[in-house]
Curated annotation (Swiss-Prot):
This is ATP-dependent helicase/deoxyribonuclease subunit B. SUPFAM superfamilies: P-loop containing nucleoside triphosphate hydrolases. [4Fe-4S] cluster binds at C786, C1106, C1109, C1115. Binds 1 [4Fe-4S] cluster. It comes from Clostridium botulinum (strain Langeland / NCTC 10281 / Type F).
Length: 1150
């Protein structure tokens, strides 16, 4: 019985020494068991290395074991395990059930138990207790020593959960974490390790469980040799926590304590020298890094480096692209093999997708060494979403998550049809399962004949029944059961009924044919995982009564703990992984990417359930558990040391200055440390672009990425930018390659691409728009905003997918409708706005809105509590609006005369006819919300009012550009009709926008009701254009003094109008505007009928017509594309507008 330490720094050859020692023992033919004990993740590599040192005939004489493998060997020899092992998934499901049963008994964790991830946290701490040989009884026996209620209650909760977990677990199962505890007991009976010589390699520390196993092995074996990655120790047992080797020295001290307690001999240690280290014999730079990275003071390396390089990049994508180029260069120039290269990072999740994308493009074979979560696998999504449909009562999200897994007998076209219908009509809950066919007609944006509509509805109902039938059956079967075991049986029947096993098998075969071996391997494991989870539920809680929601949660918990490990499909490939999972020292070349602050070294971990203070206190009381975050942070430097000393030939560290979102990233402290040690380190960056053939050559590597660089340079050449001659040679290579020539020619043609199609044939446009042209004034304005958007909306009739919600336009239409009905009700009853009873008016508004809701004309307002609130708000707004209208009318002499005055064939007035220069007549249709009239001095003055639910300003500049034409053309049409029909001398009075709102008045505590009303009136002041006539103005606001609070006018003390502070126009100016608007509409309509569909949105200083356009995905407008330019509209002052309008009319002789 003896222990021997093998000391050596990283790369000194400790592992090789072990292998050589084993070989020597075999050659000496000593009859003694030979064991190589390594961590589980190193076992495959250790076996491979051992075979390389020995041969096939002698290799079998040595066993390569991990602690887990050792346990299984002993159990097979002497017995010990009669129950099955429960995996992490089963543990989590059991813990979920225990916590649910005991949630009311928990003192600290009652609320936390509901949080996502809590089960995993509890599972982790139970694992920690077991590895540190702590039982529920030990926790309970130490409770009296714990001061402070918070920690005491925590430990009581943990003891309760842990105790019940142990009791219920051991009925049918055993925990994987119990294996080493049982191994310690069974080693006494085992003969396998009697007089054995054991070599222990690649460990930096051990858990208390493992120390107990080692103690037993020391008592049974001839000798244990253990490698320690450190200097030769001769300074006693004192450990400086800041020393890079402090974790190793702690390990040595614990082993020394064990042999001291058991009177075991300590053999003379082996100290491997490192001048140079075996690993770095061909690289003085890597040798220097190993010696000085954590030496204080360090020795500076003066020469320029070639084996250690740094790369500073613009972002993570360019970082990986540069890494790929360097790998290709190494393989071509230096004959490096992919299998000798590793790319590692402290943020594998953030880099994984980028690495996959770039390496595939560069044809670099790679394997990402990580376990895959299964929660996003379609099979798991199908199972969980099917249960979610039932537990959440057929919500849209759960139903279509289930349907979109691709594992059901519904194709994509059927799915789209069904989804469009469901979204348009807000289908949810019982609407899915009742027997009545769906008959809503509000689901298509396109007008269909009755027969076509019936056929489409029939098809939708067929798809609906096909989609819901399996889940309806599942729900029916669930309703008659209440035990966990029965839920599992019913779910299994459901999966078989939808032929899931056969579908999975077909998918696996398809993946294999397509060469997607990793996908095939993943799907091959998933079905077995599902069965394993169901089996464990049956065996652990099978007889317990649970609800459907609990079953869903238990399954969700079980699946969340599973991770799939995949085997590398080939040997010659780049290994990509996390820094913490770096498994092999047989790496020549190592790329560490993302060497940024907070990534490598990794930041401090969260303290978890037990804080650092808790752990320190428990340790002082004799309850030793895992290290606190501070100790782990000190150990992180040993991980840094181990990582940096892994490669034998070449090391490159790279760091981006920004992440994918453009947020600044700082370089790690490792970067600055290495720069100090290596004053002339090889350092590159891709931030400052250098010119020259040598730099351009770096972009020529694999065919696909080089092709992308070639296209980029050819575009520069087309744009007149000088490019390097090397791209001419590259172009010739692709031209002579059959595989690339077609792609090359196609992309070169793309240099002339434009998304513009400025005009289409007049005949075609007539067919689209109709003849004669009948068009609303708002559509004319739409054309002015962007001809292409108009063409798509009214020519192609493309519309947004209908969604069951209430948009602002919908709300505006609804409020207009109620106001119209209210206005007609006033007329019918012979009431006036300025004298009506407000209580009656408010009751009438309530009645009209309730009638609309009862008639289901706006179903959505009855569909949820949220929309009930919206309805209340609408009622408040309309009540405020009728009060406001009444106040306006009280203040003047204009009287409401027309409501919803329409211009159409069957309207109040005929369509507004306009003759184009070709002689063709177009008909404008539209509707005016309200027209007030004033009889004065033999003339009839018109005040046209447009109700708006949002903010609307009147701008002469917008009139000039054709963006604001409606009120003026209506004014012109009414004045014309009055003159021609009745011989009435009509005059313009005002064009106004009235906002429908119920504004909040702030600081009302000290305000009287009258002051509040004044504030509201002022807040809702109308915008528009008023006739510049003081008398007419007073007929709109008879109490005006200074600035009016209802119309956009200010009068001076002498009674005149302050034109600079008012929005006014003279009678002559109104006449000018009437002419200009007619001329503008004719010009716009002629452009329209000539086939102008140019993508030319307007742009002003406050925005563009693209801001809220729903057709941006159709036009692909981009100022970088040739021919794509905004129609820049400069906001003109009113004086400038008047001048411009007059000049244009004079030029056109109008």
């Amino acid at each position: 019985m003896s222990l021997r330490f093998i000391y050596g720094r990283a790369g000194s050859g400790k592992s090789q020494y072990c292998l050589n020692s084993i070989k020597n023992r075999i050659e000496e033919d000593i009859d003694r068991p030979l064991i190589l004990l390594v961590p589980e993740q190193f076992s495959f590599q250790a076996e491979k290395n051992l075979i390389e040192v020995l041969d096939e005939k002698t290799g079998f004489k040595t066993q390569v074991l991990s602690f887990k493998r050792m346990a299984y060997r002993v159990f097979n020899e002497v017995g010990g395990i009669t129950a099955k092992h429960m995996n992490e998934s089963g543990k989590s499901m059991l813990l979920y059930n225990i916590i649910e049963d005991n949630k009311n008994n928990l003192k600290v964790f009652k609320k936390a138990a509901k949080r996502q991830g809590f089960i995993t946290t509890i599972s982790d701490i139970i694992t920690e207790f077991k590895r540190y040989n702590i039982t529920p009884e030990i926790i309970l026996n130490n409770l009296e020593n714990i001061e402070g209620d918070n920690l005491k209650y925590k430990m009581e909760d943990l003891a309760l959960i842990f105790s019940q977990f142990e009791t219920r677990l051991h009925k049918n199962y055993i925990d994987n974490e119990d294996d080493l505890t049982i191994l310690v007991e069974k080693l006494n009976k085992s003969k396998q390790f009697d007089n054995a010589e054991i070599w222990i390699d690649e460990f930096s520390s051990f858990s208390p469980q493992e120390y107990s196993v080692l103690e037993k092995l020391l008592l049974k074996s001839y000798r244990i040799n253990i490698t320690l990655c450190t200097d030769y120790l001769n300074q006693g047992r004192f450990v400086d926590t800041t020393d890079v080797f402090s974790p190793i020295k702690n390990t040595e001290n614990k082993l020394l304590q064990i042999i001291e307690d058991n009177n075991i001999k300590l053999d003379k240690p082996i100290a491997l020298k490192c001048d140079p280290c075996a690993r770095f014999k061909n690289s003085a730079e890597l040798q220097h890094l190993e010696k000085n990275m954590f030496s204080f003071p360090y020795k500076e390396y003066k020469n320029e480096t070639k084996d250690i390089c740094m790369l500073k990049t613009l972002n993570q994508f360019t970082e990986i692209e540069n890494t790929a180029k360097d790998i290709i260069k190494l393989c071509i120039d230096k004959g490096c093999r992919f299998k000798d290269i590793a790319v590692i990072t402290g943020d594998l999740e953030g880099y994984e997708n980028i690495i996959s994308s770039v390496f595939l493009q560069y044809n670099i074979p790679f394997f990402i060494d990580k376990k895959r979560e299964i929660n996003n696998n379609p099979i798991i999504v199908l199972i969980l979403s099917a249960l979610e449909v039932l537990s959440k009562n057929w919500t849209y999200e759960s139903v279509f998550r289930y349907l979109k897994t691709g594992l059901l007998d519904i194709n994509n076209e059927e799915m789209d049809i069904l989804e469009n219908y469901v979204l348009a009509n807000g289908i949810k809950g019982y609407q899915w399962t009742n027997d009545k066919p769906w008959e809503h007609k509000s689901f298509s944006n396109y007008e269909l004949e009755d027969q076509a509509l019936k056929e489409l509805l029939a098809k939708i109902n067929d798809i609906r029944y096909k989609a819901m039938e399996p889940i309806v059956t599942l729900n029916k079967n669930f309703k008659s059961i209440d035990k966990a075991k029965e839920f599992c049986e019913v779910l299994y029947e459901f999966l078989c009924n939808i032929n899931l096993p056969d579908k999975i098998q077909n998918m696996i075969e398809d993946f294999k044919v397509e060469g997607e071996i990793e996908k095939a391997s993943e799907y091959n494991q998933i079905w077995n995982i599902v069965m394993e989870v169901l089996d464990q539920i049956v065996e652990v809680i099978g007889e317990e009564k649970i609800s459907l929601k609990e079953f869903f949660k238990i399954l969700q918990t079980g699946f969340s703990e599973y991770e799939i490990g995949l085997i590398p499909p080939t040997l010659d490939q780049v290994m990509v992984g996390s820094i913490t999972r770096l498994r092999s020292h047989n790496i020549n070349t190592l790329y560490i990417v993302g060497v940024n602050d907070g990534i490598f070294p990794s930041p401090l971990k969260e303290e978890g359930i037990l804080s650092d203070d808790d752990r320190e206190f428990l340790g002082d009381k004799g309850l030793e558990i895992a290290k606190d975050t501070k100790s782990i942070a000190f150990e992180e430097q040993f991980l840094v040391y181990s990582t940096l000393t892994t490669p034998s030939k070449y090391l490159r560290l790279s760091y981006p200055i920004a992440d994918g979102e453009g947020k600044t990233l700082r370089p790690s402290i490792i970067i600055s440390r290495i720069k100090k040690i290596f004053a002339n380190i090889c350092e590159e960056n891709d931030i400052v672009k250098l010119n020259g053939e040598e730099e351009e050559l770096k972009n020529i590597s694999s065919a696909k990425p080089t092709f992308n660089y070639l296209i980029s340079n050819l575009r520069k050449d087309v744009e007149g930018v000088k490019i390097d001659n090397i791209w001419g040679d590259t172009y010739k290579w692709y031209l002579e390659n059959e595989f690339w020539i077609e792609k090359l020619n196609r992309l070169i043609k793309g240099f002339d691409y434009t998304n513009q199609s400025k005009y289409i044939e007049t005949k075609k446009i007539r067919n689209l728009y109709g003849k004669p042209l009948k068009i609303s004034v708002s559509r004319v304005e739409k054309f002015s905003q962007c001809p292409f958007a108009y063409f798509v909306q009214y020519g192609l009739k493309a519309k947004d997918r209908k969604i069951f919600n209430l948009s602002y336009p919908d709300l505006g239409i609804f409020m207009h409708s109620i106001l119209e009905k209210f206005s007609h009700e006033l007329e019918k009853k012979g009431l006036e706005w300025d004298t009506m009873d407000l209580n009656w008016a408010e009751e009438e508004i309530d009645k009209l809105i309730n009638e609309e809701l009862d008639n289901k004309s706006l179903d959505i307002l009855n569909s949820s509590k949220r929309y009930e609130y919206v309805t209340k708000s609408v009622k408040k707004i309309l009540k405020r609006s009728i009060w406001l209208i009444g106040e306006h009318i009280k203040r003047g002499n204009f009287k409401p005369s027309y409501y919803e005055l329409s211009f159409d064939i069957d309207g109040d007035y005929p369509p507004i006819a306009m003759e184009l220069h070709s002689g063709e007549v177009i008909n404008l249709i539209g509707r005016v919300d309200r027209v007030d009239l004033l009889q004065k001095d033999g003339a009839t003055y018109l005040k046209i009012i447009d109700y708006k639910s949002g903010i609307k300003e009147f701008k002469l500049s917008d009139v000039y550009y054709g963006l604001q034409l409606q009120l003026l053309i209506y004014l012109d049409a009414i004045l014309t009709e009055l003159a021609e029909r009745s011989g009435i001398n009509g005059e313009p009075g005002a064009l106004l926008y009235l906002k429908l709102d119920d504004p909040i008045v702030k600081n009302t505590v000290d305000m009287s009701d009258e002051e509040i009303e004044k504030s509201i009136i002022k807040n809702l002041k109308m915008k528009g254009l008023i006739l510049n006539d003081p008398n007419v103005i007073r007929d709109m606001d008879n109490i005006i003094s200074g600035i009016s609070d209802i119309i956009p006018v200010m009068v001076k003390k002498d009674g005149g109008v302050s034109e600079g502070r008012s929005s006014v126009a003279t009678k002559e100016e109104f006449e000018t505007l009437r002419k200009y608007v007619r001329y503008t509409i004719i010009e716009i309509c002629e452009e329209m009928l000539e086939g102008n569909i140019e993508i030319k949105p307007y742009k002003k200083k406050d925005g563009s017509s693209c801001d809220y356009c729903i057709y941006s995905s159709v036009c692909k407008f981009d100022t970088n594309i040739r021919g794509n330019k905004y129609n820049i509209l400069i906001d003109k002052k009113d004086e400038e507008v008047w001048d411009a309008i007059k000049k244009k009319l004079e030029y056109k002789n109008i």
